[in-house]
């Protein structure tokens, strides 16, 4: 790489790492690198977003979907600051992302120059690798190390580079590192396998809690569950690891979860945690033996007191553990859970078919599921929309579900669909958003238009921050500042050069989704829905008490008496 500029070296190395596009916004502290990207535009495409937050969210979503490094680029100062939300999303969900941040000219660093901030200090908490590049010669080595670390530690790597360094010639050979990361298979230890197998063999009511660590072990998970006669509950980021209608599947756990999952957790005599660090202790059983499988030893016992642990690669570990356990012939617990889940499906599917005005979000999601391709990518935003998609979109084994699960940042839906369409263009990319989440990033709909991405954006529009309203009410408070000024999102889409479709009636849903999903341009389907409360699968006494307090306050202060369906509430309570 001698006699090449640092910018040239960077573009070549990114290509060697398999990167074919970079998200960001051009500007004065990265102009020299932008020039190199212009030269390499046929191999390394620059995707111009309208906000750096969207660039980082898209890079994170791409990494979650493909497992490959996502790359975003910003100028110094405000541009770098804007990256943080998306980078924290990548950190929280363990997605490998590289952020390249421009910096003021090297001769001005440390002099409080225009747009100068202390980038290393700012990125310190979010990054697993964080370096400021001080010479052209060091940049190739640092870039390789940054990407390798992002992969190995499943997190964010940041390189801060002054613009003049991109144009500086590299005066020496060779490069002492190579653009390669070899992922090893961590084999489980025999003594760990024996101990875990003993607990599983002795259990009469084992239950599996599967996390996103099982995404590369779907087949192994089902084979293990069948032999252990264990029902499977999944965390939100693991949605799709098990097909929703599989007989072992009990749905999600927590606020977005199902009643069968909650009740099975209460009844189990062994908790088997696979590839998850589920944080909500209140939804896990009390004083129950637990075993945990994870590739990261620091995760074992982090959230729940485990009796035995297994540190290994998910697929390899499950295959070996399955060989060690006995086939469980007593399947009464599994059969009872399957029966309870079927009752749950029967109950919630009534909401999907009931004719109502305004529309229910459950109806919208059910019709979308019927219209979506068998290998569609669902990029789901944060809010009540997360609840409806987690419960009512019944995924198969070929579909993917991406979401900001741990940081839970609103506005992730549209960037995720953009990333999905760019990285896997042969698949349908569908963003499912609330009006609150979409409005946070709606300025980037023109990005999809500009790059001719045939994404579909479905907006569940209740003119409200529904999850926040519900949380306020459950605390016993009257909802305040949750109503949103409505926007005609279909008209907005048309003004951006996309197709806009407004839906207000049930009979309009299927034609709207068919048109959107078969279009060769971005389409926004703006669906007006009622303000349906996202009742948890199992209502706790504390939630019922808080909501009762809200109803009394609302009656005496506003002369309004509002509550969800009594029949539905009683079924969730008892």
From Swiss-Prot:
User: What are the binding positions for FAD in this chain?
Assistant: 256-277, 294-313
Question: GO molecular-function annotation terms?
Answer: catalytic activity; magnesium ion binding; thiamine pyrophosphate binding
Keywords assigned by UniProt, alphabetized: Coiled coil, FAD, Flavoprotein, Magnesium, Metal-binding, Thiamine pyrophosphate
The cross-references to CDD domains, in alphabetical order and at most eight, read: TPP_POX, TPP_PYR_POX
Please report which protein family the annotation says this sequence is part of: Belongs to the TPP enzyme family.
| Family matches, as SUPFAM superfamilies | DHS-like NAD/FAD-binding domain, Thiamin diphosphate-binding fold (THDP-binding)
> Which cysteines does the record link by disulfide bonds?
none
Give the binding site residues for Mg(2+): 435, 462
Swiss-Prot/TrEMBL cofactor(s): Mg(2+); thiamine diphosphate
Protein residues bound to thiamine diphosphate: 52
Which organism does this record belong to?
A: Bacillus subtilis (strain 168)
* Thiamine pyrophosphate binding: annotated span: 384-464
Q: What is this protein called?
A: Putative thiamine pyrophosphate-containing protein YdaP
């Amino acid at each position: 790489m001698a006699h090449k500029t640092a910018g040239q070296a960077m573009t070549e190395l990114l290509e060697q790492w398999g990167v074919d596009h970079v998200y960001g916004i051009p500007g004065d502290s990265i102009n020299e690198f932008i020039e190199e990207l212009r030269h390499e535009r046929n191999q390394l495409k620059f995707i111009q977003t309208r906000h750096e937050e969207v660039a980082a969210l898209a890079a994170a979503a791409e990494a979650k979907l493909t497992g490959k490094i996502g790359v975003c680029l910003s100028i110094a100062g405000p541009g770098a600051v804007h990256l943080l939300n998306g980078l924290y999303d990548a950190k929280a969900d363990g997605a490998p992302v590289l952020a390249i941040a421009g910096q003021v000219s090297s001769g001005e660093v440390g002099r409080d120059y225009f747009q100068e901030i202390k980038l290393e200090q700012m990125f310190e908490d979010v990054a697993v690798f964080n370096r400021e590049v001080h010479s052209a010669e060091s940049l190739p080595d640092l870039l390789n190390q940054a990407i390798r670390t992002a992969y190995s530690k499943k997190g964010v790597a940041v390189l801060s580079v002054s613009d003049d360094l991109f144009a500086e010639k590299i005066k020496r050979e060779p490069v002492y590192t190579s653009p390669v990361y070899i992922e090893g298979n961590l084999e489980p230890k025999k003594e760990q396998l024996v101990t875990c197998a003993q607990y599983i063999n002795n259990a009469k009511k084992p239950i599996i809690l599967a996390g996103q660590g099982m995404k590369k072990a779907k087949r192994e998970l089902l084979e293990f569950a069948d032999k252990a006669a264990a029902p499977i509950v999944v965390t939100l980021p693991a949605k799709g690891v098990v097909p929703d209608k599989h007989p072992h599947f009990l749905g999600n756990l927590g606020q977005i979860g199902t009643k069968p999952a909650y009740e099975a957790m209460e009844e189990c005599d062994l908790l088997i945690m696979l590839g998850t660090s589920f944080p909500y202790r209140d939804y896990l059983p009390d004083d129950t033996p637990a075993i945990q499988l994870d590739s990261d030893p620091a995760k074992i016992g982090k959230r729940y007191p485990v009796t035995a642990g297994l540190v290994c690669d998910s697929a390899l570990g499950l295959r070996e553990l399955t060989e060690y356990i006995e086939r469980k012939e007593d399947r009464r617990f599994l059969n009872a859970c399957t029966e309870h889940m079927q009752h749950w499906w029967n109950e919630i599917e009534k909401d999907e078919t009931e004719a109502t005005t305004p529309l229910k979000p459950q109806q919208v999601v059910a019709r979308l599921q019927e219209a979506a391709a068998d290998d569609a990518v669902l990029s789901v935003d944060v809010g009540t929309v997360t609840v409806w998609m987690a419960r009512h979109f019944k995924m198969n084994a070929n579909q993917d579900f991406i979401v900001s699960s741990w940081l839970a940042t609103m506005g992730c839906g549209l960037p995720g669909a953009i990333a999905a369409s760019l990285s896997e263009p042969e698949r349908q990319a569908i963003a499912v958003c609330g009006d609150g989440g979409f409005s946070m990033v709606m300025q980037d709909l023109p990005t999809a238009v500009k790059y001719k991405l045939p994404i579909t954006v479905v907006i569940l529009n209740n003119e409200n921050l529904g999850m926040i309203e519900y949380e306020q009410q459950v605390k016993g408070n009257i909802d305040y500042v949750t109503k949103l000024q409505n926007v005609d999102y279909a008209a907005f889409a048309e003004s951006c050069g996309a197709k806009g479709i407004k839906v207000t009636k049930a009979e309009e849903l299927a034609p709207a989704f068919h048109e959107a999903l078969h279009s060769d341009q971005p389409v926004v389907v703006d669906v007006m829905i009622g303000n349906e409360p996202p009742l948890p699968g199992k209502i706790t006494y504390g939630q019922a008490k808080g909501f009762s307090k809200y109803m009394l306050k609302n009656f005496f202060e506003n002369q309004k008496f509002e509550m969800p369906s009594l029949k539905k509430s009683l079924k969730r309570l008892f």
